[in-house]
């Protein structure tokens, strides 16, 4: 069994971003994070709203860094996306931007790690 880790949901619960890191620290080493999707929110239940990655409760770089160092080897994708004018119903433009953002974070972390070892 494993957890579909909704990073945005953990962030919007009371405790905010701390919930994300607690979950990574607990489930990551146990290899129970099998799939993760990332969205950002500002605020917590009952008053929160979805926002673009990097504009909300958590630092996306820190989350991806901790995921990569926890033993997570599953899928990491964007989740719900904020709408922008001129985009299609499914938010293709924002999904593309979120995917590029996440990929950029992963590449930056990998390059940073390679520089440490050089």
Identify the meaning behind each predicted range.
Residues 1-118:
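Histidine-acidic metal/acid-base catalytic patches
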